[in-house]
Regions:
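An extracytoplasmic/periplasmic, membrane-proximal ligand-sensing/linker region
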Residues: 27-29, 172, 213, 238, ...
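Hinge/capping helix and adjacent helix->loop/strand transition within the periplasmic-binding protein
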Residues: 53, 77-86, 101-188, 236-241, ...
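Short, low-complexity disordered leader/linker segments with a strong preference
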Residues: 1-27, 139, 322
């Protein structure tokens, strides 16, 4: 009898232990692992979310920048962290759709290894050109590339990145004579563009918009859609490149798989409330990102479908990211 009573007490304690973390959460700072370097577009967006979500959660965040591998280093570290709600990451199309579609050896499963907190928003990227390149839009660029014996080279922030896929789509759909050059970061692309070492490079809107508006470079096209940051610049879809209704420009929040649902729900509620704030919407618009919350369960299903679509594009465009 005493053993039965003890077992019941232990079971009760266990149940209380599962219920208590959500009520007390967060009891310590939450580690926010970022896929990009300090000062980048993703870093700026993450710090904005942390600033606004912290008070809603009655807690705070500790930022940890872990750039590299197209974002896979930070995302993999999050997937392998304890599923207790104290490690999250800001990823999206590159880390959870395009890398899984092009890298068979990716160390994480983009769907199964994460608890999806929710979509943060959608964003485009921009193809920048040096001012001395004799092309001002995608039509002129394609004519220039195809008239050159060697074609043209363009940079992106890594094999399998959004920039790589956007460039590959142009090459595939428009039979463009172009060659991809993988860089380690957007910052390096900016430096080499301004230094005259390369003529073309894809960057995020946060990084690219000031460069265009200051006249230091010009914008050739955005991908996948027009951006509110540069509304006068055509998107690749404006130029007749169909994406089949699939996403390739989203940001999302993720925790490790197995994170208790009450904690995920608490994070999701804070995220949703943050994205409803007018000042957050306005600041995100300045960053070239449109706030657009989608619940984690729905976002996960969308991601799984998008991966399959982009796998075929990767195969057709011969994108392999080992």
């Amino acid at each position: 009898m005493r053993k039965l009573i003890l077992a019941a007490l232990l079971a009760g304690t266990g149940l209380a232990g599962h219920a208590q973390p959500a009520a007390d959460y967060p009891a310590r700072p939450i580690k926010f692992v970022l896929i990009s370097a300090a000062g980048s577009g993703g870093d700026t967006l993450a710090r904005l979310l942390a600033e606004k979500m912290g008070p809603l959660l009655k807690g705070n965040f500790v930022i940890e920048n872990r750039p590299g591998g197209g974002g896979s280093i930070a995302v993999d570290a999050t997937a392998k962290a304890p599923p207790d709600g104290y490690t999250i990451t800001l990823g999206g199309a590159t880390t959870h759709v395009l890398l899984p579609a092009s890298r068979p050896s990716l160390p994480y499963n983009a769907v199964k290894d994460f608890a999806y907190i929710g979509q943060v928003g959608t964003a485009s990227i921009v193809l920048l050109a040096s001012n001395d390149l004799p092309a001002n839009n995608l039509t002129e660029l394609l004519a220039l590339a195809n008239a050159s014996p060697e074609g043209l080279q363009y940079a992106s922030w890594g094999n399998g990145s959004t920039g790589h896929f956007c460039g590959a789509l142009i090459q595939l759909k428009k039979q463009a004579k172009t060659t991809h050059i993988p860089y380690k970061s957007v910052a390096q692309i900016q430096t080499d563009l301004l230094g005259g070492h390369i003529k073309l490079g894809w960057v995020d809107m946060v990084s690219g918009t000031p460069m265009v508006k200051s006249g230091r470079v010009k914008a050739i096209a955005t991908c996948p859609e027009r951006s509110p940051s540069l509304p006068g610049v055509n998107s690749i879809q404006d130029e007749g490149i169909d994406l089949g209704g699939r996403s390739m420009g989203s940001w999302g929040l993720y925790a490790p798989a197995g994170t208790p649902k009450p904690i995920v729900d608490k994070l999701a509620a804070a995220l949703r409330s943050t994205l409803d704030m007018p000042e957050v919407k306005a600041r995100m618009m300045e960053l070239g990102t449109q706030a657009a919350f989608i619940p984690g369960d729905e976002y996960s299903v969308m991601t799984a479908k998008d991966i399959e679509y982009w796998k075929q594009i990767a195969k057709d465009a011969n994108i392999r990211n080992e």
